[in-house]
């Protein structure tokens, strides 16, 4: 008899599945972020201003929030693969529309479809890890997916900007559309041998429940709140890091970019830290990561007084933040197979809401009181998440122990 969290999975490391999900998130993240360096060329092509074209970034983010609750439940009711295919199809169509757009309204339509697709694909990708990846590999695979966000920032955006500058901005979107086609082919191939085609239907479960029922699943409210605390603290701090570093060091954007790249290198190590967390225990690792982040955010504004200390601090911040994101997404995806898609939609919603609030609320604080005060507030918010992680570990740590015992058996 299979339990709620232990549907049949592949016993070996799912290379193709991990590649498909990682590439898909990489493409979604790259397309979301690549607009920024392409804005001047887009404004020239469509005979508009940069601030108007910048609305396409906001539109993408809004449609992500719409896509998650609108399309992710398809994975709970029918199958994850179907939801992935719908998301990828919308992504390809939207990206092709952007590449071929002859006017501003058509370009905005393409961006809206691409954002809707990302809202469906990303939470479903997290849910698929819980469905299809053996417990001993989940942290590693989730680490790969999480690191793809960092790879999108470090490689995807500069590559897209280089292609746009060397050839034409349209080629950037054509290449992302090709990546989408490649991911769709991998998902179709994986779906052929999937034993988990219908989410819960084969085990005689009732049809997928409501979002309210998903929110009532044990552990979910606690770890969604931790996600919000972590992401609010992170984005509140990260949004003004570059500006602060430019004030402290001479060299402008170049020097600030190099320091931020150190953070990106640390963030990209999530595949290794996730693998270590698989062995050490996910909830226990989360408590440690949140504790380190709480201290680090409070101290980071003072780190520029020592260059080696700043580099080490940024590297540790990247490692701990990527580990936290990996652990939270893994823990939440493992809360319930029956409601997994909706739970990950809540995870996506909490993350995106934190992005908006963190940067918006900390802006006036930074201008009036400085970066050190921003660090204290973000550390306090993260500390709230740490307290909740301790509570979650004491309340639900038997789940980790149960899964480890099952794995050994």
Residue ranges of predicted features:
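Helix-loop-helix hairpin linking two adjacent transmembrane segments in secondary transporters
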Residues: 106, 135-137, 143-191
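Paired small-residue
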Residues: 90, 94-97, 105-114, 308-316
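C-terminal transmembrane helical hairpin of 12-TM major facilitator-type secondary transporters
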Residues: 283-328
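Helix-to-loop junctions at the C-terminal end of transmembrane segments
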Residues: 68-79, 270-281, 366-367
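Extracytoplasmic
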Residues: 16-50, 71, 237-242
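Cytoplasmic helix-loop-helix junction between adjacent transmembrane helices
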Residues: 110-151
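A late C-terminal transmembrane helix in Major Facilitator Superfamily
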Residues: 335-371, 378
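Conserved MFS/SLC helix-loop-helix module at the cytosolic interface between two early adjacent transmembrane helices
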Residues: 66-104
